[in-house]
Regions:
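Electrostatic cytochrome c docking/interface patches
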Residues: 1-19, 108-111
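Conserved beta-strand positions that form and line the central face of beta-propeller blades
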Residues: 5, 48, 72-75
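Sequence/structural segment immediately N-terminal to covalent heme-attachment motifs in c-type
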Residues: 10-33, 67-68, 88
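Gly/Gly-Pro-rich "capping" loops immediately C-terminal to redox-active cysteine motifs
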Residues: 13-17, 29, 33-63
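Periplasmic/extracellular electron-transfer cofactor-ligation site
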Residues: 21-44, 72-74, 94-103
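Flexible coil segments in periplasmic/lumen-exposed cytochrome c-class electron-transfer proteins
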Residues: 53, 59, 74-111
Length: 111
């Protein structure tokens, strides 16, 4: 998988969280556990990001999935700009799948 061409700052993580909440959390859930609000409505449950087969993937894996779709997930290439897709991938790896997320991002309310 490709590596991000962007060097994101900690401030960028707030934007990544907002993008994730807008585009991803409805299916993947706030913590990436595959328990989003759409699941009780009949949307097939996605695999948890915390499954070792997913958790151990590089950032480029999540960018690739957001760009091209994955399984039943539709591609977002035409809906989310490239930098923002990378930012979502960075947020997933840094904040959902590691302990390296800044406290202000963890507790921030985003819209």
């Amino acid at each position: 998988f490709a590596e991000s061409p962007y060097a994101f700052t900690e401030a960028d993580l707030l934007r990544g969280k907002a993008l994730y909440q807008s585009f991803c959390a409805i299916c993947h859930g706030a913590r990436g556990e595959g328990d989003g609000r759409a699941i009780p409505l009949g949307v097939p449950k996605p695999r948890s990001y915390h499954d070792p087969a997913v958790r151990d993937q590089p950032e480029g894996y999540f960018y690739f999935a957001a760009t091209n779709g994955f399984g039943r997930m539709l591609p977002y290439k035409s809906r989310i700009p490239e930098r923002e897709r990378w930012l979502i991938a960075h947020y997933i790896k840094r904040c959902l799948l590691s302990e390296a997320c800044p406290e202000e991002v963890v507790h921030a309310e985003v819209h």
